[in-house]
């Protein structure tokens, strides 16, 4: 069992490390826009949530792209405060709504969302767990864009395999992650 004090210290260190950065993980606006342009058509005013939003790079982009309201969910007040400031600076405060909550314990009604967006956050719950908890939140024709760490080779060197087997034991390859998404009730439209 992990030491709660050590976990809290680690989390505080990670927050301090990422404070003030535009993103708390991989990705960029160009890649995200390309993904959005390839999605199926959503309703004119889609109901959107960015889960594990950090300081909100994705939430801001989604609000601009769709001109729609975005629920930006994260547990970290510091990041949500940064997001609120950025939304004001960009004139998006009427569209971007920071929500301090556990993305794994949302109590929204079934079918409440047309688009779930989650960059670099699902692993905090475990990919399969995150998908299983989030699927009921999507409307029948809803879409989820969720990033996940994946092995791209069966022949990865021993050192990274050993590290990730300790750090994230359920990390899998792309084919297994597709199966996990399907088991959670998703039709996989593509992977990048």
Predicted regions and their residues:
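A short SAM/SAH-binding and catalytic strip from SAM-dependent methyltransferases
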Residues: 115-128
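Class I SAM-dependent methyltransferase SAM/SAH-binding core
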Residues: 49, 55-105
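Substrate-binding/catalytic lobe of Class I Rossmann-like enzymes that use SAM or dcSAM, i.e.
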Residues: 166-192
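Short, glycine-/aromatic-enriched active-site segment of Class I SAM-dependent methyltransferases
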Residues: 149-168
